[in-house]
Regions:
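Short glycine/acidic-enriched loop and turn motifs that connect beta-strands
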Residues: 41-47, 96-99, 166-168, 217-219
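Beta-rich, blade/repeat-based domains predominating
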Residues: 21-32, 74-89, 121-156, 191-209, ...
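A short beta-strand motif characteristic of beta-propeller blades
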Residues: 13-19, 66-71, 115, 134-140, ...
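Loop-centered beta-sheet repeat module
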Residues: 156-215
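Short loop/turn segments immediately following beta-strands, especially the blade-tip
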Residues: 3-10, 56-63, 102-113, 172-181, ...
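Blade-loop segments of beta-propeller domains
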Residues: 14-87
Length: 245
């Protein structure tokens, strides 16, 4: 749907259907805002066994969309998309299969063939979060790899992916020319506590760290980011709940 926003009042109007795609779970604008990418969180996109990504050109005059192309997301259930800072590649996290991938963005905004695919693997995380408050019923999908987010750091040299099912934050090096993802050494850092369920994160403005939300533990953890190596180091963890909750 396209919605018009009044910049002065924030009022929303003119809700208009502009395109139909299967189960659109997440979307992101390309660098510059001229293109839009939409993830279809399915496992049978266009008759295949994976999810899909649809690329659109955005009409700057009215916000209308023109479909450019569609690609296989290289895994089942894609739930997160992000562009690299230079706008040359699109990153995708496939939740159901636990795989992540990079796609080249062509000059016209179309997506090319995947330049890199990484299947995250390992033992499943704890079924119940160790750091959860008493009475918490937060238990979900600690049964195998489930990539929940992927994003490049502000420098564009490193890529990070949270895996809720494995309780890990994966660390990759990114070749900006080829779009190849290479596991860093070590390839991941464990979540702040067993069963924490790392989900989404944001980088500091300086690019020297990130804040990560642990969905199951209801906590926020800060990770220091070494700009030379791209490696993360766990810092402080705080509760995301009100005092006494």
């Amino acid at each position: 749907y396209r919605v018009r926003v009044d910049p002065a009042s924030g009022a929303l109007s003119q809700v208009t259907l502009v395109s139909n795609v299967p189960n659109p779970a997440q979307l992101t604008l390309g660098v510059g805002g001229k293109t839009l990418y939409v993830a279809s969180e399915v496992d049978d996109f266009n008759g295949g066994k994976h999810g899909g990504i649809t690329a659109y050109r955005v009409n700057p005059a009215d916000g209308g969309l023109t479909q450019l192309n569609q690609v296989d997301s290289q895994g089942a259930g894609p739930v997160y998309l992000s562009s690299t800072p230079d706008g040359r590649h699109l990153l995708v996290a496939n939740y159901v299969s636990g795989s992540v991938a990079a796609f080249p963005i062509e000059a016209d905004g179309r997506l090319g063939t995947a330049s890199s695919v990484q299947q995250q693997q390992g033992p499943a995380g704890a079924a119940k979060p160790a750091a959860a408050v008493n009475g918490s019923f937060a238990i979900s999908d600690h049964n195998g790899p489930h990539a929940h987010m992927i994003a490049a750091d502000p420098s564009g040299k490193y890529v990070y992916s949270t895996d809720l099912g494995l309780d890990r934050i994966y660390q990759y090096r990114l070749d900006s020319a080829s779009g190849k993802l290479t596991p860093n050494d070590p390839p991941f850092i464990a979540a702040s506590s067993p069963g924490a369920g790392p989900r989404h994160f944001v980088f500091t403005p300086q690019g020297d760290g990130l804040w990560l939300i642990n969905e199951e533990a209801s906590t926020l953890t800060f990770y220091h980011l070494d700009k030379q190596s791209g490696l993360l180091r766990e810092g402080k963890t705080v509760s995301a709940l009100p005092e006494g909750y």
